[in-house]
């Protein structure tokens, strides 16, 4: 982190004050990087996902001293560049995608270590199961559509107790009313006025397209 701090200050020192300075770090938080910056308000993280020349995601993260205008400028820049930027609502190590990936990775390591599955078993399960579906809808929307008209509300009310079951080594958060409402409202907002049957139909068509494309490739 010390080298990163020195490098960031050297970079900023030679740039005009109206230039946004972006870091592609995948681990450090901008609040740490900008501690020695003379103009920290223009420093922001633009974290791509590997391979960045194919995948469109870029996570935009400001630090405690980053200005809102710098965050918005970075978002607009990546959007104009053809990427799909995502502004984090709150600074957190690992951002969004890496934290989700790390959770999956750690559970996979546990399964291999305990002799429950081989690396090949794990990849086969993902490739032929949740992965194609997640390409189409993502984790939250997939569970929302899976419960029909009731959506995420039905999912959490019916399967909420399963969060205490030993299906993962990760400890689940308490399913409070606030957390339930955030999930339900978020999924309803994504779905909009589209009926769940249409959402499910579009999901199925897209998954078939993904699977057919993979078959042709192999």
Describe the predicted segments one by one.
Residues 80-83, 87, 114-218:
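NAD(P)-dependent Rossmann-like dehydrogenase/reductase catalytic/cofactor-binding core
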Residues 1-7, 12:
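Single conserved hydrophobic/aromatic residue that forms the stacking wall/gate
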Residues 77, 110-111:
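Residues within well-ordered alpha helices
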Residues 20-90, 94, 98:
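Rossmann-fold dinucleotide-binding core
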Residues 102, 112-114:
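AAA+ ATPase "lid" subdomain C-terminal helix
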Residues 97, 101-107:
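Structural/interface elements that position substrates and couple domains in central-metabolism enzymes
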Residues 15-16:
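Helix-to-beta-strand junctions that scaffold the AdoMet/dcAdoMet cofactor pocket
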């Amino acid at each position: 982190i010390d080298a990163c701090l020195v490098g960031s200050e050297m970079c900023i020192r030679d740039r005009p004050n109206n230039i946004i300075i972006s870091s592609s770090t995948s681990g450090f938080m901008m609040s740490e990087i900008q501690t020695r910056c003379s103009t920290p308000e223009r420093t922001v993280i633009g974290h791509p996902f590997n391979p960045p020349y194919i995948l469109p995601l870029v996570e935009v993260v400001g630090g405690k001293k980053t200005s809102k205008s710098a965050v918005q400028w970075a978002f607009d820049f990546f959007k104009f560049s053809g990427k799909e930027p995502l502004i984090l609502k709150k600074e957190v190590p690992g951002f969004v995608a890496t934290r989700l990936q790390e959770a999956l990775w750690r559970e996979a390591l546990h399964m291999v270590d305990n002799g429950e599955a081989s690396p090949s078993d794990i990849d086969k399960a993902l490739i032929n199961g949740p992965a194609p579906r997640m390409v189409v809808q993502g984790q939250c929307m997939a569970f929302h559509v899976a419960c029909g008209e009731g959506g995420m509300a039905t999912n959490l009310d019916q399967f909420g107790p399963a969060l205490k079951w030993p299906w993962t080594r990760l400890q689940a958060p308490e399913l409070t009313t606030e957390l339930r409402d955030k999930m339900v409202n978020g999924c309803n907002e994504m779905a909009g006025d589209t009926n769940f049957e249409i959402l499910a139909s579009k999901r199925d068509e897209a998954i078939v397209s993904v699977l057919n494309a993979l078959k042709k490739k192999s």
